[in-house]
Amino acid sequence: MEGVLNFLTNINVIFTLLGYLIGGIPFGYALMKIFYGMDITKIGSGGIGATNVLRALQSKGVSNAKQMALLVLILDLFKGMFAVFLSKLFGLDYSLQWMVAIASILGHCYSPFLNFNGGKGVSTIMGSVVLLIPIESLIGLTVWFFVGKVLKISSLASILGVGTATVLIFFVPYMHIPDSVNILKEVDTQTPMVLIFIFTLIKHAGNIFNLLAGKEKKVL
């Protein structure tokens, strides 16, 4: 019993669980329910992120669909950022900060508040890593926005955005940047971000097949 109590009161465990719970807050689901009486998990792809929210609202002719989708995107991004910010605020070491980031991503994708359903996690991914690898993340966010704006293919923008940040972690750390934002100085490996990118590819497997077949839908 004492071992269980020690485990549950361990600050690393507490913050990992907290990161998971924060990431699990289903903003897209909540806003759609509150303002439109719609269950976003039963519409379109069933995802709770900005893309499905946008498609669902535009299909109903809602005039402020883009604004609501943008709000969902921002909230999903900031919940990942907030989880990591708390871990930094309380002085957790970098390896635990990365663990909290990953936990927040898993929380979004497998929300405990939605029977472990959720979204694909890209907004939360970019938010959670921006305080850990800001240079790579901001460039990745730029690519994500640019591809999404020009090609209007959300899945491709997401994959390229996270992919860009992942590729950059093999170059940026060797430049003259502060140790506090250098992944090799933080955890001595690029593995956490590589795993996040692999997870992104897995979550977008269906989209990748559609892209290769030329059948992937554009954002309306």
Curated annotation (Swiss-Prot):
The keyword Cell inner membrane applies. GO terms for biological process: phospholipid biosynthetic process. Signal peptide: none annotated. Its main location: membrane. It is a multi-pass membrane protein. Pfam families: G3P_acyltransf. SMART domains: G3P_acyltransf. The chain crosses the membrane at residues 11-31, 70-90, 96-116, 127-147, 153-173, 193-213. Keywords: Cell inner membrane, Cell membrane, Lipid biosynthesis, Lipid metabolism, Membrane, Phospholipid biosynthesis, Phospholipid metabolism, Transferase, Transmembrane, Transmembrane helix. Its EC number is 2.3.1.275. InterPro entries: G3P_acylTferase_PlsY. It catalyses: an acyl phosphate + sn-glycerol 3-phosphate = a 1-acyl-sn-glycero-3-phosphate + phosphate. The keyword Transmembrane helix applies. GO terms for cellular component: plasma membrane. It is found in: Cell inner membrane. One of its GO terms (molecular function) is acyl-phosphate glycerol-3-phosphate acyltransferase activity. Pathway: Lipid metabolism; phospholipid metabolism. Belongs to the PlsY family. Catalyzes the transfer of an acyl group from acyl-phosphate (acyl-PO(4)) to glycerol-3-phosphate (G3P) to form lysophosphatidic acid (LPA). This enzyme utilizes acyl-phosphate as fatty acyl donor, but not acyl-CoA or acyl-ACP. PANTHER family: GLYCEROL-3-PHOSPHATE ACYLTRANSFERASE-RELATED (PTHR30309:SF0), INNER MEMBRANE PROTEIN YGIH (PTHR30309). HAMAP family: PlsY (MF_01043). Probably interacts with PlsX. This is Glycerol-3-phosphate acyltransferase. It comes from Helicobacter pylori (strain HPAG1). The lineage of its organism: Bacteria, Pseudomonadati, Campylobacterota, Epsilonproteobacteria, Campylobacterales. The gene is plsY.
